[in-house]
């Protein structure tokens, strides 16, 4: 696949991920849309294959981080926040103990 196709595919993937991650949050959706478009326009005239592949790698990493790490929170009451976890969210089931360890 040539680089134009890869760039277009990444552009569309980032926008789809943005819509999924920031669902029902107009402010975050608009800010993410502007940032994605701005970054792609800034590098529109890039011709170096090495730089293009570096930017593609960076964009792919950003998409993965957005998809697996960002959690959307919704304010319900004055002191409550409800987190909406998606199926793509990276969940590590690591046991956690907040009690201090006993020293022997």
From Swiss-Prot:
Record InterPro entries: Complex1_LYR_dom, Complex1_LYR_LYRM7, MZM1/LYRM7
Gene it is expressed from: lyrm7
Keyword NADP found: no
Task of the protein: Assembly factor required for Rieske Fe-S protein UQCRFS1 incorporation into the cytochrome b-c1 (CIII) complex. Functions as a chaperone, binding to this subunit within the mitochondrial matrix and stabilizing it prior to its translocation and insertion into the late CIII dimeric intermediate within the mitochondrial inner membrane.
Subunit description: Interacts with UQCRFS1.
Alphabetized PANTHER family for the sequence: COMPLEX III ASSEMBLY FACTOR LYRM7
UniProt entry tagged with the keyword Chaperone: yes
Protein's cellular compartments: Mitochondrion matrix
Superkingdom of the source species: Eukaryota
Alphabetized UniProt keyword annotations: Chaperone, Mitochondrion
Biological process annotations from GO: mitochondrial respiratory chain complex III assembly
Family membership noted in the UniProt record: Belongs to the complex I LYR family.
Cellular component aspect of the GO annotation: mitochondrial matrix
Organism of derivation: Xenopus tropicalis (Western clawed frog)
Protein name, as recorded: Complex III assembly factor LYRM7
Residues making up the signal peptide according to the UniProt record: none
